Structure formats: C-alpha cells, structure tokens
C-alpha cells in the first residue's frame, strides 16, 4: 500500500527538504503535531491513514480467511500501529521508524487487529 504523498517534497533528499522548506521540514521530522501538509501540497497524515485503512478493509473483504501479506512504507505503517494500539497517529518519529525489510504480524478477529509478534 502506498506511502504518504509528500507533495513538493517528492524526490527531494532530506537536505533539500530542510534547505527549501526549513519550517515544515523541522515540524515533520521533529514536531509532527505541528506539521502542516498543505504548506507543501502534501497529503495530511489523517487522510493517509484513512486511505491505508480503506485499502486494508478492501483486502479483508475479498480475503475472508487465511494469511495476507501487506507491504508498505514506514510512515503509514507506523500510523497503522498507533491506530491498532489506540495511540495518536501523530506519535511517529521519522528517525525511529522500522527499517527496510522489518515486519510485524497481526491477527484480525471480530473487527479488530492484534499484534501477534514482531521479528
């Protein structure tokens, strides 16, 4: 499932983000609660999570049983974990996201996700 759309930041390096958009770069990476996606023509985090959950629900409606592998990116996955754990979606820190190739296993029962194990 797709990552958050980062608007004018798409394709930029971290250095370029901080050079061209220092205030929003600082907010996103160090104070995400004050990040204003509209300032960089990006998808806001709430909309990204809603889009992700819509995709997950579509998959669950098609595949009523068995195992499902979902491959996605760190930011949207971190927001999903916060959603499952009833934490704020803004409790993310880009500097501590799961690494490439990391995974978590969830079960889904009675309309709820439960983390089973991680690597």
Give, region by region, the residue ranges found by the protein language model.
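Domain-level recognition of soluble alpha/beta enzyme cores
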Residues: 85-114
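Short, active-site-adjacent cap segments at secondary-structure transitions
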Residues: 3-4, 76-78
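Active-site catalytic microenvironments for nucleophilic, acid-base chemistry
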Residues: 58, 62, 83-87
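Generic beta-sheet signal
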Residues: 59, 64-75
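Short glycine/proline- and acidic residue-enriched helix-loop micro-motifs
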Residues: 25-47
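Phosphate-coordination/substrate-recognition cap region in phosphate-metabolizing enzymes
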Residues: 1-26, 95
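Conserved anionic group-binding/transfer micro-motifs
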Residues: 17, 48-49
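Short, solvent-exposed aromatic-acidic interface loops
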Residues: 116-119
